Amino acid sequence: MQGIEIEEDIDVQIDINVSSYIPDEYIESSTQKIEVYQDIALCKTEEDISEIIDEITDRYGNMPDEVNNLIEITRIKQMCKIANIIKVNQRRENVVFTFNEKEFNIDIVQKLLQKFRNQIKFSPGAVPYITYKIKNLSDTIKEIKEFLEECK
């Protein structure tokens, strides 16, 4: 029997200050709403996300900001998995990115410290994390995605 390595699917926790839900005015049926939430949760790739966006807009029309935010949070989760980040937690203008200590890469942190200088603080320890200061709260999702892009 050969040993087969099974990739662990990390459940990334996201707690940021944006409205992300499906409004009743957009999808009235609870059953359809649950189906859409499930479909969004099952997205694993950018292709999956594009397909679900097309499907939602075809069935229900242009997405309101709250649904767009829900989709963007799904993108953020995917980016976190690639960057080995297990948790994103926002408190006012600070966003804390907690790394998976099993897959932690100090080279990424050094790169981030050079790029974001006065905007981040690194806290080593049993569970390393970075605190990132958002410049503009109305661009929270955009700034988080830009930060995560640099974590590759």
Task: List PLM regions with ranges.
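Accessory helical-bundle/CTD segments and flexible terminal tails appended to RecA-like ATPase motors
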Residues: 1-152
